[in-house]
């Protein structure tokens, strides 16, 4: 195996480590995290880049927040996991800055820019809005090159936090980029919130940052045996895994496309009220969240467009983080996400109202978010491998990631606003520019809720199903 790696490796020699760099060992995580996360936020005020940079510099000099300015380096480790360290300079200089920040000034309006105008913007906040964002998914409007995955970061001497600010006559777009190996969306949201605290002069509200070397899963995995994990007998392996992979390859032949959907808060509230009314006929005190209802409603729309065989199993994974189990006084930035699994026959999902699926989603979250289940899941993963796959060979896999707790649409940059507008200076729209390549299941992200209570989602689905989904959303708009 080492001989094969020698002749097939394209790795470059990493840059020399600074003689006084402190080395922080990152926890091992699955290779799926070796990608970047790239997000574009649109503000309807012009922002002062100097104020944003100065407050960011100040944050990255505080305690373990400094580790965000470290350089990724690969270390020899188990090939099934990402083995990286952070090499943190003893001081940040012009040659080795804590972050990358580029600014572009344009005399044009945002909607006059050939790429910026493609960013979704709510035109009628009372309707379900549907955006084809294919042309807007260009991850940069100014950057010529940046590392695309963790290994490329390790071959550079670049800091992992990158920002591009595009100031227009009537607003600002900020492009945020970081390697996923460092943080999940909620962790990045905690970083952004700390940044706004510094910008707003609320230094006492900046939380202590948990160092990246502290493995959250190691804190938990030794307390409950692996056999206690609810799905420990549902590991997909061997021939069954091969069958599932072949089916997934076939279903990806036509390719996938991404769309953004903005759903009015009033529609989701009304749908939730109806869901609770339905459930109250069989439960004393039913509860489902707005997110449960949003996912259940749209997954049923997706199933109607895909029209899968009813005997197949829908495996709906819902990402949740485990920070609620950790001491609240510190900010835990590192990846802390687990998946709650809802497994149901497709026929049962489509023949029942959305309240049925919403209730099942909530049940899976309640069941798998307990401290005992998370501990058992950590112990089980230690036994079976760092990236197990649960389900059946015939399953229709649909992954959902909820970024709403990251609060990206609550980011208030008011003190940096050059042009003042009523209310807080928060993003008016959001776009996930992360590049998903290769074979993927059906995948959706709840990006968050905006200041007008609209829910933003971004879905990557089979190309052929989008026309039917758009017709269904148009029908809903006409009947409301």
Curated annotation (Swiss-Prot):
Gene3D superfamilies per the record? Chloramphenicol acetyltransferase-like domain (3.30.559.10)
Single GO MF descriptor? acyltransferase activity, transferring groups other than amino-acyl groups
Effect of a null allele: Leads to complete loss of production of austin.
Listed EC numbers: 2.3.1.-
* Alphabetical keyword list: Acyltransferase, Transferase
What's a GO biological-process term for it?
terpenoid biosynthetic process
Q: Any idea which residues are catalytic in this one?
A: 180 (proton acceptor), 412 (proton acceptor)
Q: Which domain of life is it from?
A: Eukaryota
- Give the pathway annotation: Secondary metabolite biosynthesis; terpenoid biosynthesis
Q: Which Pfam families match?
A: Transferase (PF02458)
Q: Record's family?
A: Belongs to the plant acyltransferase family.
Subunit (UniProt): Monomer.
What does the record give as the function of this protein? Answer: O-acyltransferase; part of the gene cluster that mediates the biosynthesis of calidodehydroaustin, a fungal meroterpenoid. The first step of the pathway is the synthesis of 3,5-dimethylorsellinic acid by the polyketide synthase ausA. 3,5-dimethylorsellinic acid is then prenylated by the polyprenyl transferase ausN. Further epoxidation by the FAD-dependent monooxygenase ausM and cyclization by the probable terpene cyclase ausL lead to the formation of protoaustinoid A.
List other remarks. Answer: In A.calidoustus, the austinoid gene cluster lies on a contiguous DNA region, while clusters from E.nidulans and P.brasilianum are split in their respective genomes. Genetic rearrangements provoked variability among the clusters and E.nidulans produces the least number of austionoid derivatives with the end products austinol and dehydroaustinol, while P.brasilianum can produce until acetoxydehydroaustin, and A.calidoustus produces the highest number of identified derivatives.
Name listed for the protein in its UniProt record: O-acyltransferase ausP
According to the entry, what is the taxonomic lineage of the organism?
Answer: Eukaryota, Fungi, Dikarya, Ascomycota, Pezizomycotina
């Amino acid at each position: 195996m080492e001989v094969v790696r020698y002749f097939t490796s394209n790795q470059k020699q990493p840059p020399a480590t600074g003689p006084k760099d402190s080395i922080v060992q990152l926890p091992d995580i699955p290779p799926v995290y070796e990608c970047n996360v790239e997000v574009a936020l649109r503000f309807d005020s012009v922002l002062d880049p100097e104020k944003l940079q100065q407050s960011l510099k100040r944050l990255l000099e505080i305690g373990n927040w400094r580790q965000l300015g470290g350089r990724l380096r690969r270390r020899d480790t188990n090939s099934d996991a990402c083995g990286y360290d952070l090499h943190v300079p003893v001081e940040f200089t012009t040659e080795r800055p804590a972050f990358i920040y580029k600014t572009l000034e344009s005399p044009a309006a945002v909607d006059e820019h050939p790429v910026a105008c493609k960013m979704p913007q709510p035109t009628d906040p009372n309707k379900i809005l549907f955006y084809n964002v294919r042309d807007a998914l260009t991850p940069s409007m100014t950057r010529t090159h940046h590392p695309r995955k963790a290994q490329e970061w390790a071959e550079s001497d670049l800091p992992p936090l990158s920002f591009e600010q595009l100031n227009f006559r009537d607003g600002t777009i900020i492009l945020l980029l970081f390697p996923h190996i460092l943080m999940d969306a909620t962790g990045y949201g905690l970083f952004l919130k700390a940044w706004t605290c510094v910008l707003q002069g609320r230094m006492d509200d900046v939380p202590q940052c948990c160092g990246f070397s502290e493995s959250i899963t190691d804190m938990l995995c030794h307390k409950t045996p692996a056999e206690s994990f609810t799905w420990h007998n549902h590991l997909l392996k061997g021939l069954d895994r091969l069958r599932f992979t072949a089916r997934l390859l076939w279903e990806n032949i036509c390719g996938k496309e991404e769309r953004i959907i903005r759903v009015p808060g009033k529609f989701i509230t009304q749908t939730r009220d109806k869901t609770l009314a339905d459930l109250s006929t069989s439960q004393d005190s039913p509860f489902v969240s707005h997110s449960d209802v949003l996912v259940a409603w749209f997954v049923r729309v997706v199933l109607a467009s895909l029209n899968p065989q009813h005997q197949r199993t829908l495996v709906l994974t819902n990402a949740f983080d485990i920070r609620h189990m950790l001491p609240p006084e510190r900010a835990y930035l590192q990846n802390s996400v687990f998946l709650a699994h809802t497994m149901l026959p497709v026929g049962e999902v489509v023949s029942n109202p959305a309240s049925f699926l919403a209730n099942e989603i909530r049940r899976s979250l309640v069941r798998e978010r307990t401290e005992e289940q998370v501990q058992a899941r950590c112990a089980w993963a230690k036994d079976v491998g760092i990236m197990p796959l649960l389900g059946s060979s015939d399953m229709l896999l649909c992954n959902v990631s909820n970024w709403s707790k990251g609060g990206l649409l609550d980011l208030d940059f008011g003190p940096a606003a050059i042009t003042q507008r009523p209310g807080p200076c928060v993003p008016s729209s959001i776009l996930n520019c992360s590049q998903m390549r290769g074979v993927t299941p059906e995948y959706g992200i709840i990006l968050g809720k905006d200041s007008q209570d609209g829910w933003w989602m971004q879905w990557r689905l089979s190309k052929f199903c989008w026309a039917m989904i758009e017709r269904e959303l148009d029908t809903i708009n006409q009947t409301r």
